[in-house]
């Protein structure tokens, strides 16, 4: 679990950029070192803990895991957003599915069906089910997940990230009142996306 200001996957990028900055400073001077300092700052910003924009809210007739009528909330994460993923509810991972796919721009409507993706089906103690899917984009060519089947997650727990430009989809049953709409800005671990009616 990652509770720090930067997720652990980011430290290697930050450290590498700072190392190169030091090497360039002593080898070639300040002017050559500055771009690497800027790069380290960018990596710190990118891998911070967390945001995104609601790309769409779609009604579905059925979902393989949730079962029955449901609602899909699609959150687009640009290169400037945080690509850290958090569990929307406390529960056990009952289903996990990874699909190899394309790397189309994450804002395209068809990415949920065509792009590389990793889906988790989570069920709480009362039998309430949701699915959350990490979807890679044109720059995001690595989906990272630190959880697996049968793991228990707490609400808001960081469980993975998508590196550089992506989309996240959340599918909830129709008895959830969705509190966001297309175009809304959301922040991971803070914004409430829905409430059970």
Specify the residue positions occupied by each region the protein language model found.
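Contiguous, well-folded functional domains in the mature portion of proteins
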Residues: 1-197
């Amino acid at each position: 679990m990652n509770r720090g200001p930067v997720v652990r996957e980011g430290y290697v990028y930050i450290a590498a950029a700072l190392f190169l900055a030091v090497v360039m400073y002593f080898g070639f001077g300040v002017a050559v070192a500055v771009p690497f300092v800027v790069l380290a700052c960018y990596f710190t910003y990118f891998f911070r803990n967390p945001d995104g924009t609601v790309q769409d809210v779609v009604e579905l007739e059925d979902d393989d895991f949730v079962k029955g009528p449901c609602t899909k909330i699609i959150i687009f994460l640009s290169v400037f957003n945080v690509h850290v993923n958090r569990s929307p509810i406390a529960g056990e991972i009952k289903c996990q599915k990874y699909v190899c796919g394309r790397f189309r721009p994450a804002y395209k409507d068809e990415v949920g069906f065509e792009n590389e993706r990793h889906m988790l089906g989570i069920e709480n103690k009362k039998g309430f089910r949701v699915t959350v899917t990490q979807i890679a984009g044109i720059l995001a060519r690595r989906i990272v997940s630190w959880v697996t089947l049968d793991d228990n997650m707490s609400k808001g727990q960081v469980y993975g990230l998508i590196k550089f430009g992506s989309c996240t989809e959340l599918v909830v049953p129709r008895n959830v009142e969705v509190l966001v709409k297309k175009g809304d800005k959301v922040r991971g671990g803070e914004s409430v996306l829905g409430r059970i009616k």
